[in-house]
Structure formats: C-alpha cells, structure tokens
Amino acid sequence: MNQDTICALATADGVGAIGIIRVSGQDALAVVNRIFEGKNLEKVPTHTVHYGFIKDQEEIIDEVMVSVFHAPRTFTAENSVEISFHGSPHIAKKILEALLKNGARTAKAGEFTMRAFMNGRIDLSQAESIADLIASENEASRKAALEQLKGGISKEIAVLRGDLLNFTSLIELELDFAEEDVEFADRSALMGLIANLKTKLGSLIDSFQYGNAVKNGINVAIIGKPNAGKSTLLNALLKEERAIVSDIAGTTRDTIEEVLHIKGTAFRFIDTAGIRETSDTIEEIGVKKAKEKIASAKVLLYLYDEQDSGVEEIISFIKEFYRPDLKVMLLHNKIDQNKGVSAENISEIDQALKRELVPDYTDTILGISARENINIELLKAELSSFVETLKGSENAVVITNQRHYEALRKSLDSVERVEEAVVSGIHTELLAYELRTALEHLGEISGEFTNDEVLENIFSKFCIGK
C-alpha cells in the first residue's frame, strides 16, 4: 500500500458555508503542521479540534478549524487531518496548493476508501456501500446501504465461508492421505451442509430482485394504444403537466421518463408512444423505442377503455410482452366517461380479461380515471404493495450490488456441482476443487479474493474526496 500523504476536497464543489479538506497518510500531521499557525499538531491528542490559520509561507489563506486523528482510530486507519475552512472554491484551491507544496499529493478517486479497505478497516462490500450511501436518493436505498456498511452482508458471507472452509480442509486432508483411502469428511454431513448452503445462497440471490429495485429504482412502462390516456396518467401520478396531452392520437412520439418516490422507493415511470401499426416514420421510431422500454421494465401498466379494439387484442398484446419477472397491471381508464364501468371492475371487458389473463399473466385489474384522478392513489398503493412482495423477512440481508449477485450465483453453481459429485461418488480431488471455487467466489464479495483490475474499477467510481 502506498504510504504517500494524500489530500482532497471532501465537500461538494462550489460555494458553501463550510468546506472540508481531508489529509491522510503517515506524514499527514507533519504536512498540515507546516502550513498551520496555531498549536503544534504533531503533539496534540487524537480526536481533537484546534483553531488557527492556514498559511502559504507568510501569507494567511484563511481562518480554520483543524481536526486531528491518530492512526489507527481513523477512517483510513492512517494519521488523518480534516481542515474546515470558509467555503470558497478559491480558498479551497489555495489550501490544496499549499498542501501539495509541503509534501502531500492529490488523492485519486476513491483513494481514502481504498486505503480503509487495504488497511483492514473495512472489507470490500462495506467500501462499496459507502458509494451507495452517498448515491442514495430515497429512504429504502439509504437503509440498504447503511445495513451493508454496518457489516450485514459481511457477517452473512463470513458464516457461509466458515462452514465451507471447515469441510474444504477435511476434503483436502483426504487428498494428503489418498493412498491410505481414509475418509475424513462424512459424506452425509457434507450433503447436509450443501443443503444448508443452497438455502442460504438461494435466499441471498433471491433478495437481489428487491435490493436492485431499492438501489436503482423500478422501471414502470405505461403502455397502450394511441390516445388511451398514458400521458394524462403520467401527469396525474406526478401531479404536474409533464407530458403533452391531446385528443389527437399519436401525440407522444418519444418516451418521457420521470421518477416518483412512493413510500421510500423510486419508481421510474416511462410514458411510451402509443403502440400501433403506422406509416409515419417518426411515430414508428417512437413505437420501436417503446418496445425497448417494455423489455427493461419491471412493471407494465396497460391502459385501455371501452373504445379499445377489444379483449382479444389486449390479451394478444400482453402475451407478446409478458415475462415471468414482469408485473402486469391492467388499468381500465376513463371510468368517469362510461356509466357501465366502475372501480370494482364489473364491465364485460374486465370480466373477459380476468378469465383469460388472471392469474397466469396479471393479478391486478383496476378501474381508474387519469383525467379525474379517480383511484390514482389506489394505483400508487398497488405499486408499493408490489415492492413489498419482493421483500424477504424484515431482518433478512438484502443484496443490492450486481457484483455480489454474480459472485453468489457462481458460488451456488459450484456448491451444486459438489452435490452432484458426492451423489455420483466422484473423486475427492474434484470435490476439493469445487469447494475451493465456491470459497473464492464468496471471498470476492468481501475482497479476500480479488485483483487490482477489480479494485481499480470499483474505486474509480468514487468521488475524489472519498
């Protein structure tokens, strides 16, 4: 690990009441002391704050408060200093220049957090959670990132690795005594361990569906024929005139995307062009983009009304785009204009759709009026309930990181191959190889098994001061 003393602005760029510059490294106290007029920072106790001035030679740059932290009780586990100054970008630039002149260098993106990881202060999953916490935009993503930072995933992985390691050691011991044909690892006990691992790994893998939704939001595609009321629905959900509304079919030519937070979860609503056969080149491009958005959606809101082409066309459309992981909600729009239709979905078209589509393709048919805001809050409640169905038990660990998800999948694959090998009575050497592989994939999550390229990719996504 590089022992250079590094420095960077820790607060956001721009003017503010207070700015903070972080300094970390073996010589951090000495470097800052060279430009600080006040107490001798190399002699003050750890976790103390001191008033004084930052100087560049004889020129006073600013009046500051300096916080001193001695290794190893710091974020990076190195000597660290934080300089709080009046939040002018010009002052920040001058202080950083003074630090560079006196032995520090500019930190790379994520280098403070990388040092915390390399010095054993946090593991790799906790390091990634810091970036997630900074990027969190809603309550659900904040809580998930904080739980990961507190070590929720780390503890779960440590237990799994501990169980695997015990058996791997016994299997490898058998290899050492291969000529004596001794069996150290009880195969029935190994099968019990495998069953337990499969359950735990499967639970973590399944949690990614909810975790990914929490972290990145849920894509909701609003679809239907031209003039079905899709743009009106988007405006009703957002409570603002975001999309152009017109009686002319085909008004929306491109997709419009807006994020709405419902009970702490971000829903990304996508108003698509009405899907129909058309000779209009621009509208045709819009229809193509709409179909692409449907492919990436987690929820499909299909709008129709009594003037629609009928049940068969709606059913055909839903079946064309349906996927097992897609939540489909049929919204019978404009119920304010049709006396025979109610919020209880008693119309003939609704009953036919229920017979044909429920429960194989959808479990929700709801009567609404986007124009009159009828049942819009009920629609939001349905969306929120859908998120709850993705959630496991209240205290279960949730996977939010794609890298962790892929490592868990690979580990489960290896565990399943171990199971096959035990059942088939395959040679101990293959068992040992697959057990080691499963261990390594779990170790990728915590950072025990990784490489410089992976680390560089992870930490390069951080901001400079973190």
Task: Please describe what each predicted stretch is.
Residues 87, 237, 272, 304-307, ...:
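Glycine-rich, N-terminal phosphate-binding loop of Rossmann-like dinucleotide-binding domains
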Residues 269, 303, 331:
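Generic enzyme active-site microenvironment
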Residues 283-307:
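Inter-motif core of Ras-like GTPase G domains
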Residues 1-143, 147, 151, 322, ...:
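A glycine-rich (often HGG/GG-containing) alpha/beta subdomain
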Residues 2-9, 13, 52, 142-261, ...:
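C-terminal-of-GTPase-core extension/linker across diverse P-loop GTPases
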Residues 267, 299, 329:
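Short, Asp-centered acidic motifs that coordinate Mg2+ and/or phosphate
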Residues 51-70, 250-278, 296:
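Switch I (G2) and immediately adjacent beta-strands of P-loop GTPase domains
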